[in-house]
């Protein structure tokens, strides 16, 4: 960064891009520079003498209970842009092996449905419905088969926003709509999913009373911000209280799944091994001859990690590099 020169944030540039074509070039240049410095150049410094990169998974750094990855952070390989995704092609298994990658589908929304006991959302998951299309149908009062792609995208933002205690202001910024319209989406959501509203409100009340929240498995997260004299800090504390039982329970489930998968691989005498966890995703390096058995084992143990009102769904891909397996 040049002294005395202000750096314009990316979100500001994105708003200017439609009016000034050069802005798109600036954003692309920043993106490419980031990919080169952080990943193309940055990862090469972590290659060990055995030709591999060995990350460190930390158990007690994040407040939510999620594992974090450091030196290097392999949980932060880009996924939103195709060029960033291609970085995964440099991660290869041993010769003759392949990767099996299994990912929980919408785990936090499934946890929300189970914790809240909201019958409508539980039923949607049990029926195998597209939960974002189902929510769009309810929130926008549109027949399920007539929901537009835009309505589904907006409903997806509301679904995930609710998990993080999003405000009308935050949702309006995310969707580029008025604050009044965003509040209407949120209000309609809670009318259609009343048990979710009750659950979130009760969770905040309990957190204020106790000073902490709990996951489904009883793991505690203190929230001192709820007692702050600063209004903004208290608001932040309320959002944390809403989200922590959901994200924390999801973190507990994936850790239980990791233990189950690891133990089963050993019990079955397989040479395949669990090599990485990326939030809701487990990556296994497997022998070609063990592939089918490993896929069945992996999906069974991930689904069986928790018994609740909403079943866990798992998607699995295989490939000869991490990109193809993701």
Segments predicted by a language model, with ranges:
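Function-dense linear segments that define catalytic or interfacial modules
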Residues: 59-144
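Conserved catalytic core of nucleic-acid polymerases
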Residues: 18, 54-55, 59-62, 137-270, ...
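Short acidic (Asp/Glu) and glycine-rich catalytic loops that position anionic groups and cofactors
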Residues: 1-10, 68, 87-95, 110-117, ...
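A structural signal for short secondary-structure junctions
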Residues: 92-95, 267-270, 275-279, 306-309
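Conserved short beta-strand edge segments in small beta-sheet-based binding/regulatory domains
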Residues: 305-317
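Short beta-strand->loop micro-motif that forms the acidic, two-metal-ion catalytic signature
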Residues: 281-286
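A common structural junction motif
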Residues: 192-194, 300-308
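Conserved "right-hand" nucleotidyltransferase catalytic core of DNA-directed polymerases
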Residues: 1-82, 92, 98, 108, ...
